[in-house]
């Protein structure tokens, strides 16, 4: 699929691609045929910022949802790049430096903790979706 920063990756591309798809949105975000370069961690963060439940069927996304996914994909990836990536276990850059993006996780690895969104009283819950860990606010991700 297109790179997240490619002009082809836009709300119209997403909306058209998803029109009749019954797969959940999280599976599409980590599918390299749909868009390149989004892994599990970033998919969780993108969906949180977009207020979308990872189990939501792709064909049910509105154009507004699609626009938010595009915008938040770029936001999350730029933030991660600027912070050197995410060092969960032993990841280091080529120069041997650990990334700092994990310090800003909104949902990933926050099972049982309060949602970081202002005025939300939700609790982050871990779910296994397609054999991958997913983290979802039980209130603000619909």
Predicted regions mapped to residue ranges:
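Basic, amphipathic alpha-helical segments enriched in Lys/Arg and hydrophobic/aromatic residues
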Residues: 65-82
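Short, structured motif recognition centered on aromatic/hydrophobic residues
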Residues: 5-6, 38, 69, 107-110
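Catalytic cores of DNA base-excision repair glycosylases
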Residues: 34-36, 57-65, 76
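Hydrophobic/aromatic-lined pockets within catalytic cores
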Residues: 47, 51, 78-81, 141
């Amino acid at each position: 699929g297109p790179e997240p920063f490619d002009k082809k990756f836009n709300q119209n591309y997403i909306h058209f691609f998803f029109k009749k798809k019954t797969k959940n949105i999280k599976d599409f975000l980590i599918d390299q045929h749909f868009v390149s370069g989004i892994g599990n961690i970033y998919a969780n963060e993108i969906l949180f910022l977009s207020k979308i439940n990872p189990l939501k069927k792709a064909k049910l996304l509105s154009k507004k949802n699609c626009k938010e996914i595009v915008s938040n994909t770029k936001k999350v990836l730029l933030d991660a790049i600027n912070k050197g990536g995410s060092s969960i276990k032993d990841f280091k850059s080529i120069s041997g430096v650990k990334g700092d993006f994990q310090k800003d996780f909104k949902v990933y690895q926050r099972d049982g903790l309060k949602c970081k969104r202002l005025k939300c009283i939700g609790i982050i819950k871990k779910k296994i979706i397609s054999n991958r860990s997913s983290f979802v606010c039980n209130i603000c991700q619909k």
